[in-house]
Amino acid sequence: MLIGFFVAPAYDFWLARQRYEYKYNLAGSLTAITALLASLCAVMIVLHMNAKELSDVANGRLYASNIVSYIVYGILWFIIIFRGKTFFNKEYWKFSLQLSIPLIGYALAAQVLSVSDRMMISRMVDNSAVGIYSTLYTVSSISLLVWSAINASFIPYLYQNIESDKNEIKKYSLLLMGAYAIVAALLTFFAPEIVRTLATEEYYEAIYIMPPIAGGVFLTCVSNMYSNIMIYYKKTQYIMYASIAAAATNVALNYFCIAKFGYMAAAYTTLVAYIVLALGEAVCAHVVCKKERGANYEVYNDKAVGLMAVMAILLCLSGLIWYQYAVLRYGIIIAGCAVGAVLGYRVIKMRKVKQ
């Protein structure tokens, strides 16, 4: 792990630069090749250890897959160091620390926001409730994989155009939000099928916690969009403030609501906490933009973003109704897929134009 902590940032920095320069083919190829080689190496080691009847196969598999990744990361580390020809630069370190130290507070608060509900359910209810809640929380969060990819592609475009007076960022951001809202909603409507496939019948009884969790998870895209602005203007302390407020809200609400309404209440307290996070970061970003660019400047169409966020949450929560009507639910899923395809096509078309 220590070796990984040392060399993995080189890969992250390299990947961020490739995305910023729109070199997705190279980044995607290296990522895919590394993953393939790591998987093949792990399989070969496991088969060899089983054939030799060796113990500790799990550690063998772990070392095999990680060694391949760390070799790739190490090569990139040496390339970056060689090209930079500098190990320590006071100006760079000062800039990085000023930008990153508040984000440590954000990361800690985000971790509290993410796991506090499960820890409190364990203490206030029982471990079986934790198992059910954790499984459905994980399923509800699958859409974050989609948003992570979207956000990674959007950040370079945002930072290259944020100083422009054009309104293209407003249009592009709403398209991306709309596409992600469709993904989050469709995942919510597919909840019965997903839970039946991945879990036992006792988990199915708790599918009604998925809509509020999915609505809260969707708001991650709103908070990320506004936190991107604060990172650009080097005001990361505001990100920390908003995340601490959200984490504190979640812990306080869980303390009272889980005891009174049971573990399912944690899904709704999570939604409220994410609303606090998104709203807090939107307000902070507005304050930062006002200081940096003037009172009337806004990067996004804030009213449209707020309206879309409300609509997305309501759409996710409507799953509480549609779970009882399979035919109507499938009809909504088909319509959502069609709308998602149209939005996805428009996003891809705009991305090609920007490149």
Model-inferred region functions:
Residues 28-83, 245-249, 263-285, 332-333:
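Hydrophobic alpha-helical transmembrane segments
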Residues 136-166, 170-173, 227-232:
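Helix-loop junctions and terminal segments of transmembrane helices
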Residues 46-50, 108-142, 192-202, 260:
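Helix-terminus/linker motif at the lipid-water interface of multi-pass membrane proteins
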Residues 55-59, 95-99, 103, 121-141, ...:
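Interfacial/gating helices of multi-pass transporter permease domains
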Residues 54-62, 71-114, 153, 157-167, ...:
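Interhelical loop/hinge segments that connect adjacent transmembrane helices in multipass membrane
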